[in-house]
Amino acid sequence: MHKTLSSLAIIPDGNRRYAQKNNIAVEQAYLAGFRKSEEAVRWCGDSGIKTLTYWALSLDNFSKRSTDELSLLFKLMKSHAQRVLDSQAYKDNEVTVRFFGKRELLPAELNRMFSKVEEMYPERNGGLSLNMGIAYSGRDELLNAAQKLAADISSQKVRANSLTESEFEKYLYLRESPDLLIRTGDSHRLSGMMPWQTVYSELFFSPKLWPEVTKADFEEAVAFYDSTDRKFGK
C-alpha cells in the first residue's frame, strides 16, 4: 500500500511514434495504448493510489487529426468502453469512472456508451477514481469555468469581490490536484493538462512511448515522487 501518493495524472504520449518505430498499423498502436491504460489502472490499484486522471484525447485532436484517424479512435474508444462495462475487476475493486471534457463533440453513440460506463461505475468510497479526459483542453476548461462564473456573477449568485480559489474550483471539470503527473514520449511539457490543478504537482517525464511503459517504469515514477521534498510555495 502506497501511503503518500494519492492522486496521479498521466499524459500517455507516443502511440503513433510507436507504430512507426515498430512498423505496425496505427490501429495496432492505439490498441496497445488502450491496453496499457488498463494496466495502469491495475498498477494504481496495487499501489493504493486513490485517483487516476488520464488524458485520452485532446481537444486539439479534433482539428489536427484526419477524419479517418478520428473515426478509428472513436471505434477503439467504443470497444474499450465495452471492455470496461464487462470488466469484473472494475466491479470487484469498486472503481469509479468519470469522463470530462467537451463530450458534446463526440459521436452520439460513443457518448451514450460513456454515460453507461459512468452509470455502471458511480462514485463510491474505497476504490480507485478514474477520470478520463476526452476532447479536453486546459485552456478550454478555464474558459468554460470563467463563462459559468460570469453568468453566476451576472445573476448575483456569486459576489465577484469575495470570490475565493476554492469557490472558483467548483467551476472546473475536476477540483482535485494531482500529486504526480507522468508524461511519456519524451516531451517535457504539459500541453495544457490541468493548468490550474497542476501548479504544485511533481512532474515526471519518461522517454518511453506509452505502449512501451512497464510496471517497472511506473514504479520508477513513484520512487521519484517519494524522493521529492514538496514545498507548496514555501
Regions found by a protein language model. Name each.
Residues 1-234:
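Flexible, compositionally biased loop and terminal segments
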